[in-house]
């Protein structure tokens, strides 16, 4: 019998694939149905964000951060303003810190709702996204009421936040929490015990602790491997050290564990939100939301109508911006997808000399080859769904 040359089969996954999460293109090398190699092609959404930020003042560079992980925009802004505040050595008033923490946790819920429901959709369940997006819509309205924009907020500013929250909004956020937890339990009851969902996710995409550290995993990916590493606890920033919450960790480090962690993190985020709301309506009901340093934070409109100095400060801030002392800082926050870091180099002018953005999804996507090798073709979508990729931050 003649010898037959059996060669592997190459297939393109994306960039228009419904499960490709944006503009991802993966070249898969298959041996029958088994994945031998995965080659992610990135760069289809590259906009040169880091270079653009070097041509803008610090205040003008803020909105670029919203356009990275556009599922939870305020979490990215948080890292950038913390880096500027570290350079300038300024303190944010407690009420401003609480508002930031509140909206960071809203962002975490926005992200995890999208991820767990689309992860279920990737493996064939169509109901969860409809349920999840109903709650996301309510949270988007809170974004809109705080700053006027549903998505690209530009709400966190160096020194604090853009404007104070009306009391009615804080009350409405407090009233949102309990109904949200009820709907989360319904979603949990629908998806978690589902036989098909379990078969598609249990023991898929397993990663050991050593491998997770070596591949610079962070966020849910490292906690799924059983490491209680969360920057809100291990390197607390803002007022997270005053908040009570738990860090869920995984046992088997597979796709199912990562799903369960995200579900539990939403409950913990709701717990933090409740604490913020109680303090914003109680002990911290009044007080400034931004630093009172007029060289960094613009004055109120009412001041500008009666004070020449306020008008000058306002004009200088929005034309020239503020100057930072020369130096370099790295600040990381626990974004919903993992450790989002901003490395900022200042040369003493009103623009950053260099901005490096450390996106968690970038490191996770690099591990696609390692995670998927030896699995079936259908498992590639389950793994991709569980590592939570958004291309805005991967390509920057």
Swiss-Prot record:
Q: Which UniProt keywords apply?
A: Cell inner membrane, Cell membrane, Membrane, NAD, Quinone, Translocase, Transport, Ubiquinone
Q: Where does the source fall among the domains of life?
A: Bacteria
Q: Which PROSITE patterns match?
A: COMPLEX1_49K
Compartments where found: Cell inner membrane
Asked if the Swiss-Prot or TrEMBL record annotates the protein with the keyword Cell inner membrane, the reply is yes
**Which reactions appear under catalytic activity for this entry?**
a quinone + NADH + 5 H(+)(in) = a quinol + NAD(+) + 4 H(+)(out)
What EC numbers are recorded for this enzyme?
7.1.1.-
Q: Name one Pfam family in it.
A: Complex1_49kDa
| Gene Ontology, cellular component aspect | plasma membrane
Hey, which family's this protein in? Belongs to the complex I 49 kDa subunit family.
Please give the PANTHER family that the UniProt record associates with this protein: NADH DEHYDROGENASE [UBIQUINONE] IRON-SULFUR PROTEIN 2, MITOCHONDRIAL, NADH-UBIQUINONE OXIDOREDUCTASE 49 KDA SUBUNIT
> Tell me, how does this one assemble?
NDH-1 is composed of 14 different subunits. Subunits NuoB, C, D, E, F, and G constitute the peripheral sector of the complex.
Task: Quote the function comment for this protein.
Answer: NDH-1 shuttles electrons from NADH, via FMN and iron-sulfur (Fe-S) centers, to quinones in the respiratory chain. The immediate electron acceptor for the enzyme in this species is believed to be ubiquinone. Couples the redox reaction to proton translocation (for every two electrons transferred, four hydrogen ions are translocated across the cytoplasmic membrane), and thus conserves the redox energy in a proton gradient.
According to UniProt, the name of this protein is NADH-quinone oxidoreductase subunit D
Q: What is the lineage of its organism?
A: Bacteria, Pseudomonadati, Pseudomonadota, Alphaproteobacteria, Hyphomicrobiales
Give the gene that encodes this protein. nuoD
